[in-house]
């Protein structure tokens, strides 16, 4: 069982890539980094539980229904507070970048207290726990620390995506708050920019090749926080519509680099969440069909990056795909990227 803790938000987007100034209506979806991971993980074949706080209202009900609709256990969601967090997304196009405006001040999770969750009960039977750096940015970090301490006591694997958001807090505060938390983390997901800005970790002098730079960062981060594995993600933006992505896994003193994906983007929100869900899937006990051998680090990072790539083709925050579909993408890129119709 995977347990995810974080905020579920309402997403409002102008249709057809209109700008905010042109919008006469908004498309409504629900998501959030941790919820996206839980939903994607369940579709791959795992079991997940979502922990958050939502208001007792029609909008809160809609958010719960959205996540529960994917098969995620929502029994640990606390219902209190006055409002749901919102974010407005203006999708970019060509040379116009996407824009995000958050409206999450005083949302339900911002008022969470230690009394809201019985972590011993919530984490009973859990194998994995996932959070991102967004959660301590928008809520009391002590509540998250309580969960991490129970995970340590119970031997539950902890996964963290740093997922820094400059509109939520400064790099100085983020680094100070997250540093003690990362000592509880088994697998850390981060990119080069955030490793530098939050934790002061940079590649060794004179290292220029992208994979060598990421390998240097992985080694240093593992030593700094004691993580078992470090995953570093990379992206090259050609335009708002076209990106190239890859990832690197540092574990057991060895580096595994994923295939590179050239993407034409439908919706890039949630790509990193899909990667995290796929990584957890590769190390979980739910892979009865052995789609990914847990001892094969190269195949693990290839599977995770394939999930990231596939999410960019799916509208909304959540990757909607089974593990077999992710595997098909993983194999297709090794076959020159040829995509065949499934009949």
Regions inferred by a protein language model and the residue ranges of each:
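Ribokinase/PfkB-type carbohydrate-kinase core domain
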Residues: 1-3, 68-69, 74, 92-255, ...
């Amino acid at each position: 069982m995977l347990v995810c803790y974080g905020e579920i938000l309402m997403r409002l987007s102008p249709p057809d890539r209109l700008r905010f100034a042109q919008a006469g209506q908004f498309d409504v979806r629900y998501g959030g980094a941790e919820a996206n991971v839980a939903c994607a993980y369940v579709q791959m074949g795992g079991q997940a539980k979502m922990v958050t706080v939502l208001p007792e209202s029609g909008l809160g009900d809609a958010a719960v229904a959205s996540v529960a609709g994917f098969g995620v256990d929502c029994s640990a969601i606390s219902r209190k507070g006055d409002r749901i967090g919102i974010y407005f997304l203006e999708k970019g196009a060509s040379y116009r970048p996407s824009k995000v405006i958050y409206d999450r001040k005083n949302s339900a999770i911002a008022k969470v207290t230690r009394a809201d969750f019985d972590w011993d009960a919530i984490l009973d039977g859990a194998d994995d726990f996932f959070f991102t750096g967004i959660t301590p940015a928008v809520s009391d970090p002590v509540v998250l620390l309580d969960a991490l301490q129970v995970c340590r006591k119970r031997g539950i694997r902890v996964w963290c995506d740093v997922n820094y958001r400059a509109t939520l807090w400064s790099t100085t505060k983020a680094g100070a708050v997250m540093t003690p938390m990362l000592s509880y983390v088994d697998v850390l997901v981060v990119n080069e920019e955030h490793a530098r800005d939050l934790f002061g970790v940079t590649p060794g002098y004179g290292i220029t090749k992208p994979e060598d730079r990421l390998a240097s960062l992985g080694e240093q981060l593992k030593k700094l926080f004691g993580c078992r594995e470090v995953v570093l993600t990379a992206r090259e933006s050609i335009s708002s519509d076209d990106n190239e992505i890859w990832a690197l896994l540092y574990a057991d003193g060895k580096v595994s680099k994923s295939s590179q994906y050239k993407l034409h983007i439908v919706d890039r929100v949630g790509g990193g969440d899909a990667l995290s869900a796929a990584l957890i899937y590769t190390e979980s006990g739910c892979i009865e069909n052995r789609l990914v051998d847990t001892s094969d680090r190269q195949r693990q990072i290839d599977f995770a990056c394939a999930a990231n790539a596939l999410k960019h083709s799916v509208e909304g925050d959540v990757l909607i795909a089974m593990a077999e579909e992710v595997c098909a993408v993983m194999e297709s890129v090794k076959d020159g990227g040829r995509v065949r119709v499934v009949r």
